[in-house]
């Protein structure tokens, strides 16, 4: 595996196909809050304060001077109310950190904080930055999902595209939603309700097993709440196939129920990235290196199939096979998203979301990307693996892929 060389100033960027000499982007540490359910332990914490908790939790563990940070990049969806005004910058200042450090907020829908990590890695690889804090924050209890879109109704926009002549010319006025997309996926890949219920139940079972085994202990920072210290994800539920079978479909005549969907959640996550020069100058010990970052897109009507071509693209770019990947985190926005991906990519199901996914653990939108990244890193270390791959479906049909190599 690559090592940090005191004399190195640049290394070939793996998989770029051009032989360009660029610096490595090292993963120094990654943390997250436990995920709170809607109305749960984190519901009363202002989003700015929630983000500040993640930054503090990260930097307290890494013991780096906050003034050394070149930029703070945070993912957040529905940037209105307490999540407006560039929450990356506001939460950094709320944490008490230096005013001279800038911040920027990213919205790539559900993949926002995964994209934040990618932007941070790109800044380091290009040599324009040495230390980046990347992550995400979302309080869905305070700012409900799609708030930014529903606010537009007062200005005459019933959807982001309802008045776009060019959009209507290309896609018509058909429904564009994650619910329809999930149903279309289930239909195209012939996924039965019973299969999706079994998958969803497995997510809860794996999450409970991971919590009992302490798999998340090192990645979760403690949040002091009015009811005491908060350290355990609130989402996993004791369920059964019988209970799931009794639920009504999300749409009339559909196959999907609430049991197959990710949970509305609150949380924050943070990752520290550094160049090899910063590793040497600040005495840092990397846990991994960024091996590959990319994003691709697919049909916006199906919306959630992007991880399939995105994964193929990433594997082709790096020359890796799916069997070379030791652990995978793919966001469980809905059960059919992961199940279709498994059918197409032919990954070992045991390696995919081995500690449960968003169906059980929750999906705090803008924070989920860095949350999954954090869990992937911890799992790689736990099993002694080399490569981890993360991918997420996103609104509009896009998908990110990140591959890391454990050091």
Curated annotation (Swiss-Prot):
GN (gene name): fadA6
Q: What's the stated role of this polypeptide? A: May be involved in the final steps of cholesterol and steroid degradation. Catalyzes the formation of 4-methyl-5-oxo-octanedioyl-CoA (MOODA-CoA) and acetyl-CoA from 6-methyl-3,7-dioxodecanedioyl-CoA (MeDODA-CoA) and coenzyme A.
Pathway named in the protein's UniProt entry: Steroid metabolism; cholesterol degradation
The domain of life is Bacteria
- Which residues act catalytically here? 110, 363, 393
Q: Which CDD domains match?
A: thiolase
Q: What are the EC numbers?
A: 2.3.1.16
What further note is attached to this protein's record? Turnover of MeDODA-CoA is low and FadA6 may not be the physiological thiolase responsible for MOODA-CoA formation.
Is-annotated flag, keyword Acyltransferase?
yes
Please tell me which top-level EC class this enzyme sits in: transferase
Q: Which UniProt keywords apply?
A: Acyltransferase, Cholesterol metabolism, Lipid metabolism, Steroid metabolism, Sterol metabolism, Transferase
Q: Where does CoA bind?
A: 178, 237-239, 262
**Keyword Iron listed:** no
The UniProt entry's GO biological process terms, in alphabetical order, are: cholesterol catabolic process
The chemistry this enzyme catalyses reads:
an acyl-CoA + acetyl-CoA = a 3-oxoacyl-CoA + CoA; 6-methyl-3,7-dioxodecanedioyl-CoA + CoA = 4-methyl-5-oxo-octanedioyl-CoA + acetyl-CoA
Q: What protein name is recorded for this chain?
A: Steroid 3-ketoacyl-CoA thiolase FadA6
Q: Specify which residues bind substrate according to the UniProt entry for this protein.
A: 395
Taken from the record, one Pfam family name reads: Thiolase_N
PROSITE patterns xref list: THIOLASE_2
Family of this protein: Belongs to the thiolase-like superfamily. Thiolase family.
Provide the GO MF annotations for this entry.
acetyl-CoA C-acyltransferase activity
């Amino acid at each position: 595996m690559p090592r940090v060389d005191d004399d190195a100033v640049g290394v070939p960027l793996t998989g770029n196909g051009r032989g360009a000499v660029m610096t490595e982007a090292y993963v120094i540490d990654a943390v997250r809050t436990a995920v709170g359910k809607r109305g749960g332990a984190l519901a009363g914490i202002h989003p700015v304060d929630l983000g500040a908790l993640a930054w503090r939790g990260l930097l307290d563990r890494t013991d780096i001077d906050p003034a050394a940070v070149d930029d703070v990049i945070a993912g957040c969806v529905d940037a209105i109310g307490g999540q407006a005004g560039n929450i990356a910058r506001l939460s950094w200042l709320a944490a008490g950190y230096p005013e001279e450090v800038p911040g920027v907020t990213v919205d790539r829908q559900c993949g926002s904080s995964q994209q934040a990590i990618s932007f941070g890695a790109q800044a380091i690889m290009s040599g324009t930055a040495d230390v980046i804090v990347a992550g995400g924050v979302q309080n869905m209890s305070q700012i409900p999902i799609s708030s930014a879109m529903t606010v537009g109704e007062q200005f005459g926009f019933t959807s982001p595209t309802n008045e776009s002549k060019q959009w209507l010319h290309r896609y018509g006025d058909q429904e564009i939603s994650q619910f329809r997309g999930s149903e279309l996926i289930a239909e195209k890949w012939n996924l039965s309700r019973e299969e999706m219920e079994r998958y969803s139940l497995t997510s809860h079972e794996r999450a409970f097993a991971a919590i009992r085994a302490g798999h998340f202990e090192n990645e979760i920072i403690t949040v002091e709440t009015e009811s005491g210290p908060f350290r355990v994800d609130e989402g996993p539920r004791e369920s059964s196939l019988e209970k799931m079978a009794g639920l009504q479909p999300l749409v009339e005549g559909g196959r999907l129920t609430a049991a197959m969907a990710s949970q509305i959640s609150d949380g924050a996550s943070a990752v520290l990235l550094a160049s090899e020069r910063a590793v040497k100058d600040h005495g840092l010990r990397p846990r991994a290196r960024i091996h590959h970052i990319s994003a691709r897109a697919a049909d916006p009507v199906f919306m959630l199939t992007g991880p399939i071509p995105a994964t193929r693209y990433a594997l082709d770019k790096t020359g890796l096979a799916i069997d070379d990947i030791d652990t995978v985190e793919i966001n469980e926005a809905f059960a059919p998203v992961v199940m279709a991906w498994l059918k197409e990519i032919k990954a070992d199901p045991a390696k995919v979301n081995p500690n449960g996914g968003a169906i059980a653990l929750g999906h705090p939108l803008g924070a989920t990307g860095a949350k999954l990244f954090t869990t992937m890193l911890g799992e790689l270390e736990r099993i002694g693996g080399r490569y981890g791959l993360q991918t997420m479906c996103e609104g509009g049909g896009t998908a990110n892929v990140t591959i890391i190599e454990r050091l």
